[in-house]
Structures are given as structure tokens and as C-alpha cells.
A protein has these predicted regions:
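Active-site-proximal beta-strand elements of phosphoester/diester hydrolases
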Residues: 1-5, 99-108
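Active-site-proximal loop/helix segment associated with metal-binding centers of metalloenzymes
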Residues: 103-150
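Short catalytic/ligand-binding loop motif for oxyanion handling, primarily in non-cytosolic enzymes
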Residues: 36-37, 67-69, 97-102, 110-113
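N-terminal active-site segment of His-dependent metallophosphoesterases
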Residues: 1-59, 65-74
Length: 150
């Protein structure tokens, strides 16, 4: 499963009032769950439900986890953050469950220097369009982090 986007109120309400069908022992959430610097989202009742219904919950950060001025390198290149005993967010980790290796890593693009301006403009245009003309809260550093331009 991916793209829960718990940072959006409508999605959080839906998740709060609707349970997902349990379809296995391990739940993998492949990105875009909540902003990593959000102090409320990790306390969501969803994690209690997931912990009770799955043997293991493996969360991999996507690009949206690093929005809202969360520095991609703040935690380093390899880390894990346990929300519950069996619910964790993993970056550049391998978790072995029953002889199956789960390789948990955010994949970033390597944008050639000559294309940096095009990606920069595209991100700003898409964010402004999404916000319907409102001032976007994206700075130059965010653009470089999101698109892997260093």
C-alpha cells in the first residue's frame, strides 16, 4: 500500500473512520504516509490498529515525507524509527521476515545539471497549480532534495 497522505485532513478522516481489509501478516507502506517532522501523525490511532492487525508494518519514506522543510539528511543515510514494537519507518535498511528480505529505501533521481532548471520550474509550477495560485512553500533547497539535484 502507498500514498496514504495522512497530512491531508480528508485522508486522515477517512483512515480514522474506515478500516482497511487485513490481507496478510506484513503490511508494507511504500511512501507518502506523513511528514517526518509532524509530531501528531505518529500518534494516530491507525498505527495502533496496524500494530494489532499485522505481525510487522514496514514503512518506507517517499518524497512527501520530506516536505514541510524536513531535511532529507537530518537523520543520515541509514536509519529506522519505531512507532510501535512492530511498526517502523526504515531508510536504507534490509528487514528479514521468514527468509524474505525486504529492501527498504527511498529511491531518488539523479538529475543532470543541464536539466536542473527545467525540473525546478516544473516543481514550482505544479505546486502553484495544486495550491491554485497560492504562494508555494517550496524553497530552492527543497527542490534540490526532492529531485536529487546536488
Amino acid at each position: 500500500m502507498s500514498d496514504l497522505h495522512m497530512e491531508f485532513a480528508e485522508n486522515s478522516r477517512y483512515i480514522k473512520h474506515n478500516e482497511f481489509p487485513v490481507t496478510g501478516d506484513v503490511l508494507v507502506l511504500a511512501g507518502d504516509t506523513f511528514y517526518l517532522n509532524n509530531t501528531v501523525a505518529p500518534l494516530s490511532k491507525f498505527w495502533k490498529w496496524a500494530s494489532a492487525n499485522y505481525r510487522q508494518v514496514l514503512i518506507v519514506p517517499g518524497n512527501h515525507e520530506y516536505y514541510q522543510f524536513c531535511d532529507v539528511m537530518e537523520r543520515g543515510l541509514q536509519w529506522k524509527w519505531m512507532l510501535k514494537d512492530n511498526v517502523g519507518i526504515y531508510q536504507n535498511q534490509v528487514v528479514c521476515i521468514d527468509n524474505t528480505d525486504f529492501i527498504l529505501s527511498t529511491l531518488w533521481s539523479n538529475i543532470p545539471a543541464q536539466d536542473e532548471y527545467w525540473y525546478y520550474q516544473s516543481l514550482h509550477l505544479s505546486v502553484r497549480g495544486f495550491l491554485k495560485g497560492a504562494q508555494a512553500s517550496v524553497n530552492d533547497k527543497d527542490v534540490r532534495v526532492l529531485y536529487g539535484v546536488w
